[in-house]
Amino acid sequence: AAMEVIESATQTIDVLFYIISDDDTGNHVVDALTEKARNGVKVRLLMDRLGTLRGPSKAVKALRKAGGEVLFFSPILQLPSSGHLNLRNHRKMIIADHARVFSGGMNIGEHYMSDHPHSDHWVDLAFTLEGQSVQTFCDVFRSDWEVACGEDVDHITTPAPTTAGNATVQLIPSGPDIVEDPLHDGIIRALHLAKTRIWIATPYFV
């Protein structure tokens, strides 16, 4: 599904992940981004510096050479020290043409995306999305990109897409810049509003 979203892009691809591993899966994804950049697609790749300490550096270098923009969120060795070593970005998303999204709990790597029956991989949830909620993903990516590059970027507002399905979707970002806890409030509200069914998918239930 992640590769399908990348391959569908004709104008822009925005990618944000905590981990992109230096393995067959990680290199395959970055190579696909590089090919898109060579073909004139605007590619922006944002990775967490700590999560990608062992990332596919050669493939990323090739992406930059092809015209792709690459930034790291919260570099570890940054002077003067900002004291934000534990400020990590765990978001995961691929946005194609501001119209389609791949997101969820998966990072990019064999441990997350391998379909080999004997592989030691995580069982994780991911989804693809089209419709009006995509704009919120675009806004979140733009905000994180601005933090990483230290300057404002042009805000791209896409025409409101037609409804792609009948699902109700709400993206709830969280972080130290958000004072309240909208995720907690949103979950409680959703539970109260449920009439026939409650499905919960989470790796942790503390």
Write out the residue ranges for each language-model feature.
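Charged, low-complexity intrinsically disordered terminal segments
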Residues: 1-206
